[in-house]
């Protein structure tokens, strides 16, 4: 599977050929997680509407929820103004974080409204 050249030409990748992907829950607006993608992961996501990412540690693709059942159905994919990050607007089934929490950003609040 290959990424549409019109999309690929707009992406800015790091030295490893990767760019960041932010998953946001469609119903709440919550930022759920941040992961890495390459062209193939983005192409698979666009084709299947399943959040597909690239694991730097395992050096392989993974589909969110493939083993846990905590799937992401992708409604929208947006490219940021710099071309180095994509936003996936998803319906999250179950926990988004590998720790079992709804979002990866709900445990350590460094600053909040008083």
Curated annotation (Swiss-Prot):
Protein's pathway: Amino-acid biosynthesis; L-histidine biosynthesis; L-histidine from 5-phospho-alpha-D-ribose 1-diphosphate: step 3/9
Chemical reaction(s) catalysed: 1-(5-phospho-beta-D-ribosyl)-5'-AMP + H2O = 1-(5-phospho-beta-D-ribosyl)-5-[(5-phospho-beta-D-ribosylamino)methylideneamino]imidazole-4-carboxamide
Superkingdom, natural source: Bacteria
UniProt cofactor(s): Mg(2+); Zn(2+)
Top EC category: hydrolase
Cofactor detail note: Binds 1 Mg(2+) ion per subunit. Binds 1 zinc ion per subunit.
GO MF term list: magnesium ion binding; phosphoribosyl-AMP cyclohydrolase activity; zinc ion binding
InterPro entries attached to this UniProt entry: PRA-CH, PRib_AMP_CycHydrolase_dom, PRib_AMP_CycHydrolase_sf
Keywords carried by this UniProt record: Amino-acid biosynthesis, Cytoplasm, Histidine biosynthesis, Hydrolase, Magnesium, Metal-binding, Zinc
Residues annotated to bind Zn(2+): 81, 97, 104
Subcellular location(s) of the protein: Cytoplasm
The EC number(s) this enzyme carries: 3.5.4.19
Biological role: Catalyzes the hydrolysis of the adenine ring of phosphoribosyl-AMP.
Family affiliation: Belongs to the PRA-CH family.
Quaternary structure, from the entry: Homodimer.
Name of the protein: Phosphoribosyl-AMP cyclohydrolase
Gene name linked to the record: hisI
